[in-house]
């Protein structure tokens, strides 16, 4: 059992200041992965040098920067922090909710009125998700036959771009409920694929019949691979049956298509207490829960494979180093079954 000591309070309080400063300096490119020194070109774009200097000075006080000939440089710890600064973006994108917590508790503001920084959220999600992409992409390219990709919840297009690096003669469909994501995705993939070979648009991915009607001619006579990266919790409404219905509709519409699914898991209290010092899962689950997103337990996700129109072909588990061996996230390759009982849905 841990005890309160002289470092407990500063360690908890420090995140209130350090996280926003790291986030904003990273987005402005003050520090990059290429060097420990300040990027002078990007520094010149900063209008308020007073605030910049105070921020840099603060980071030196907490050990992330040191001074070398009157120039700030990243320390070893600082370099590793800024190298992973994309990990700050998604939690930080929900900052309006945290800053309004008092008003929320007093009933003076509704959660739905707290805006998410969509640009930062899209940027952070895309960069954070990269670590989940590599093994599945290698697998699908070596084991599966496909000549088109339907990316449901395409975000900023990072997955699409990673697929195109390995296989560039594809037809691409990207669908997202966020107009910002649609615009960002188009911009990010535009240099890697001919314009007439992709179709990116706004839609609710749970409305399978609708988005299928928009792409039927485009993917006609092709073999689509369907991907869903961290989207099941967006459509579950906390119910397994909603995802099962979605999978059935998807299979009915694309009976020969494999699915690539990545998802985050709702860990129980015991695991969160066990791993909180080395994991951001308490924070991730907090903002997912408070924003009403339906993350399910590992047991619930595994139940999707029972009486399913898909069978599990391959599985990757992430961060399952805890006493219960429960992962914080997983990626599945799901193979479509040729025959299944629709009446079970």
What residue ranges belong to the model's regions?
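A short, conserved alpha-helix within the catalytic core of class I
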Residues: 234-249
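Conserved SAM-binding loop of SAM-dependent methyltransferases across substrates and taxa
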Residues: 156-168
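Conserved class I S-adenosyl-L-methionine
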Residues: 145-155
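Conserved Class I S-adenosyl-L-methionine-dependent methyltransferase catalytic core
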Residues: 58-144
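Conserved SAM-binding loop
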Residues: 185-186
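Conserved SAM-binding motif I beta-strand of class I
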Residues: 171-176
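Conserved SAM/SAH-binding beta-strand->alpha-helix loop
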Residues: 178-180
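C-terminal alpha-helical "lid/dimerization" subdomain adjacent to the S-adenosyl-L-methionine
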Residues: 262-308, 315
